[in-house]
Regions:
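Bacterial N-terminal signal peptides that target proteins for export
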Residues: 1-10
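Short S/T/G/P-rich N-terminal loop/turn motif that feeds into the first structured element of a domain
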Residues: 14-102, 114-129
Length: 129
Protein backbone atom coordinates (compact mmCIF):
# COMPACT_ATOMS: atom_id res chain seq x y z
CA UNK A 1 0.00 0.00 0.00
CA UNK A 2 2.76 2.43 0.92
CA UNK A 3 4.56 1.63 -2.30
CA UNK A 4 1.47 2.52 -4.38
CA UNK A 5 0.89 5.75 -2.44
CA UNK A 6 4.52 6.74 -2.90
CA UNK A 7 4.30 6.16 -6.64
CA UNK A 8 1.17 8.33 -6.88
CA UNK A 9 2.84 11.11 -4.90
CA UNK A 10 5.91 11.03 -7.14
CA UNK A 11 3.79 10.97 -10.30
CA UNK A 12 1.65 13.87 -9.04
CA UNK A 13 4.72 15.91 -8.14
CA UNK A 14 6.26 15.32 -11.55
CA UNK A 15 3.05 16.38 -13.29
CA UNK A 16 2.88 19.56 -11.23
CA UNK A 17 6.50 20.40 -12.01
CA UNK A 18 6.12 19.59 -15.71
CA UNK A 19 2.85 21.49 -16.21
CA UNK A 20 4.41 24.97 -16.56
CA UNK A 21 6.75 23.68 -19.25
CA UNK A 22 3.81 22.55 -21.35
CA UNK A 23 1.28 25.27 -20.59
CA UNK A 24 0.25 27.39 -23.52
CA UNK A 25 -0.28 31.10 -23.82
CA UNK A 26 -3.68 32.72 -23.43
CA UNK A 27 -5.05 34.12 -26.69
CA UNK A 28 -8.19 36.24 -26.92
CA UNK A 29 -9.46 36.84 -30.47
CA UNK A 30 -12.03 39.59 -30.97
CA UNK A 31 -14.01 39.62 -34.21
CA UNK A 32 -14.71 43.25 -35.06
CA UNK A 33 -16.96 45.19 -37.39
CA UNK A 34 -15.36 48.47 -38.44
CA UNK A 35 -17.54 51.57 -38.82
CA UNK A 36 -17.82 52.71 -42.44
CA UNK A 37 -16.27 56.09 -41.62
CA UNK A 38 -13.28 54.61 -39.76
CA UNK A 39 -9.95 53.86 -41.41
CA UNK A 40 -7.55 50.99 -40.80
CA UNK A 41 -5.03 53.59 -39.61
CA UNK A 42 -7.46 54.81 -36.93
CA UNK A 43 -8.00 51.24 -35.78
CA UNK A 44 -4.23 50.72 -35.58
CA UNK A 45 -3.69 53.99 -33.71
CA UNK A 46 -6.27 53.22 -31.03
CA UNK A 47 -5.19 49.57 -30.74
CA UNK A 48 -1.58 50.73 -30.21
CA UNK A 49 -2.63 53.22 -27.52
CA UNK A 50 -4.71 50.51 -25.85
CA UNK A 51 -1.81 48.03 -25.87
CA UNK A 52 0.55 50.63 -24.40
CA UNK A 53 -1.91 51.29 -21.56
CA UNK A 54 -2.53 47.56 -21.06
CA UNK A 55 1.21 46.84 -20.77
CA UNK A 56 1.38 49.23 -17.82
CA UNK A 57 -1.15 47.17 -15.86
CA UNK A 58 -0.64 44.20 -13.57
CA UNK A 59 -0.37 41.09 -15.76
CA UNK A 60 -0.13 43.14 -18.94
CA UNK A 61 3.62 43.77 -19.23
CA UNK A 62 4.14 40.95 -21.74
CA UNK A 63 0.89 41.28 -23.68
CA UNK A 64 1.21 41.10 -27.45
CA UNK A 65 -1.38 42.52 -29.80
CA UNK A 66 -2.13 41.84 -33.45
CA UNK A 67 -4.58 43.30 -35.93
CA UNK A 68 -5.62 40.94 -38.70
CA UNK A 69 -7.15 42.51 -41.79
CA UNK A 70 -8.27 40.07 -44.50
CA UNK A 71 -6.62 40.19 -47.90
CA UNK A 72 -8.63 37.59 -49.79
CA UNK A 73 -11.21 35.85 -47.65
CA UNK A 74 -14.86 35.57 -46.86
CA UNK A 75 -14.73 36.68 -43.24
CA UNK A 76 -18.44 36.48 -42.64
CA UNK A 77 -19.71 39.17 -40.32
CA UNK A 78 -16.43 40.79 -39.25
CA UNK A 79 -14.02 43.18 -40.91
CA UNK A 80 -10.91 42.52 -38.84
CA UNK A 81 -9.67 40.61 -35.82
CA UNK A 82 -7.95 42.05 -32.76
CA UNK A 83 -5.78 39.36 -31.21
CA UNK A 84 -4.30 39.59 -27.72
CA UNK A 85 -1.75 37.10 -26.44
CA UNK A 86 -0.66 36.77 -22.80
CA UNK A 87 2.26 34.52 -21.88
CA UNK A 88 0.09 32.54 -19.45
CA UNK A 89 -3.44 32.24 -18.15
CA UNK A 90 -2.14 33.48 -14.79
CA UNK A 91 -0.96 36.73 -16.41
CA UNK A 92 -4.25 37.01 -18.33
CA UNK A 93 -6.22 36.54 -15.11
CA UNK A 94 -4.22 39.23 -13.29
CA UNK A 95 -4.73 41.58 -16.24
CA UNK A 96 -8.49 41.05 -16.46
CA UNK A 97 -8.86 41.40 -12.67
CA UNK A 98 -7.26 44.87 -12.88
CA UNK A 99 -9.14 45.98 -16.03
CA UNK A 100 -12.15 47.73 -14.53
CA UNK A 101 -11.46 51.47 -14.23
CA UNK A 102 -8.02 51.16 -15.85
CA UNK A 103 -6.51 53.47 -18.50
CA UNK A 104 -6.93 50.62 -21.00
CA UNK A 105 -10.67 50.55 -20.30
CA UNK A 106 -10.86 54.29 -20.98
CA UNK A 107 -9.15 53.81 -24.36
CA UNK A 108 -11.48 50.89 -25.01
CA UNK A 109 -14.34 53.40 -25.07
CA UNK A 110 -12.59 55.26 -27.93
CA UNK A 111 -12.26 51.98 -29.78
CA UNK A 112 -16.04 51.49 -29.43
CA UNK A 113 -16.54 54.70 -31.42
CA UNK A 114 -14.95 53.21 -34.56
CA UNK A 115 -15.55 49.45 -34.23
CA UNK A 116 -17.82 46.87 -32.64
CA UNK A 117 -15.76 44.05 -31.14
CA UNK A 118 -18.37 42.31 -29.01
CA UNK A 119 -17.72 38.76 -30.25
CA UNK A 120 -14.64 36.96 -29.03
CA UNK A 121 -13.17 33.60 -28.17
CA UNK A 122 -10.45 32.55 -25.73
CA UNK A 123 -7.86 30.09 -27.01
CA UNK A 124 -4.92 28.22 -25.57
CA UNK A 125 -2.04 28.63 -27.97
CA UNK A 126 1.07 26.48 -28.42
CA UNK A 127 3.97 27.25 -30.71
CA UNK A 128 4.64 24.46 -33.19
CA UNK A 129 8.31 23.52 -33.35
Amino acid sequence: MLNTATRWMIASTLMILAAPAYSGSAMQIYRCEQDDSATDEQVDEIASAWLKAARGMKGGAELEGYLRFPIAANTGEHDFAFVLVAPSFEAWGAFTDAYSGSPAEEIDEKFDEIADCTRSAMWESFKVE
